[in-house]
Amino acid sequence: MSKVKVTILFSTYNGEKTLPTMLDALCASTLPKEEWKIVAVDNNSSDDSAAVLNSYKERLPLEVYFEPKQGKQYALTLGFRHLEGELVILTDDDVIPAPDWIEQFLTLADEQPQFAIFGGLITPEWEERPAPWLINYGHLGILYALNGGLPEGPISAALISGPNSAFRRSILGSGYIVHDGLGPDATVAQFPMGEDTAFALRLEKNGAKAFHSRHPGVRHIVRKGYVNEGWVLRRGERYGMGLVIVRPDLFDRKTKIGGLPIASALRWLLMVPASVVVKRFPLSGVRFKLLWAQSVRQGILRQFLKQRSTMNKTIYSQVGAK
């Protein structure tokens, strides 16, 4: 009979640079290895991720699987077929877990029997220290899933972050079911973000309650290229795209013309000249705040346009079929 209490599940796409750091940290886990296992899904990587994963099989209770269809949803759904134990920890391939990470989640689940969704502390592991404008004005939760300011206790599932979350296996069902349009998806340049949030919100809608604790901790590796303005603003656009899917209630009562929310469209148009001008000035908090808001609005409009295009294609195909 299996002694496994916990399954750690994650997918990786071209994660060869961060996987060794993550897996080395898991080798230091304080929980006996017969009581937990790792299910890692290689999501069609083109680097040496598979070789890195396989090289740790003798040191860790590690199972490696391959999902050729690009997209985190498909990779994790494959991983769901191999879960064991009462608790499932979902994470990413770029975290550094504390030695007692798994034990802390088990303790949390025991201490909070009325909750079925659990979040843990996420602090940064910067490859390059961010500039003051980013530290002072950037939403570090949206950008890097950091949650150091989140108090311990019951929370909305919307505050559960993908790099450090756990779920009672009994509430999960058979697959990682979220909206098909949500990323990560390596096949497109820009995708709507928010897949982890959508997954937790669906479980909450079905009756599960969420709890945050600062005790199960990970450090999230933030790559050097992720602290420059260009990457951050692209992240803002992805966030805006994701809002349309994950939080449709924010737009239900908005006046729309041609499927677009008029207020967002007008603000975006009015701020285009200011955005052009402010880019001529040095990096600063004022510049960042203006460009960030514009990027989020651009993402919102982009997603509404995408959905309108999809709807029109569906209508045309249905008319043609008749």
Residue positions per predicted region:
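Non-catalytic, C-terminal membrane-associated alpha-helical segments of glycosyltransferases
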Residues: R234-R238, D252-K322
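A conserved acidic beta->alpha catalytic loop
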Residues: D42-A51, V95
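Acidic donor-binding loop at a coil-to-helix junction in glycosyltransferase catalytic cores
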Residues: G183-F199
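Short, well-formed alpha-helical segments that are part of the catalytic scaffolds
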Residues: G15-S29
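Short aromatic/hydrophobic "clamp" motif used to bind/position activated sugar donors
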Residues: V88
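Conserved donor NDP-sugar-binding/catalytic core segment of glycosyltransferases
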Residues: D100-L134
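Short, flexible, basic/aromatic active-site loop/helix in glycosyltransferases
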Residues: Y137-A157
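Glycine-rich, basic loop-to-helix element that forms the pyrophosphate-binding segment
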Residues: E67-L83
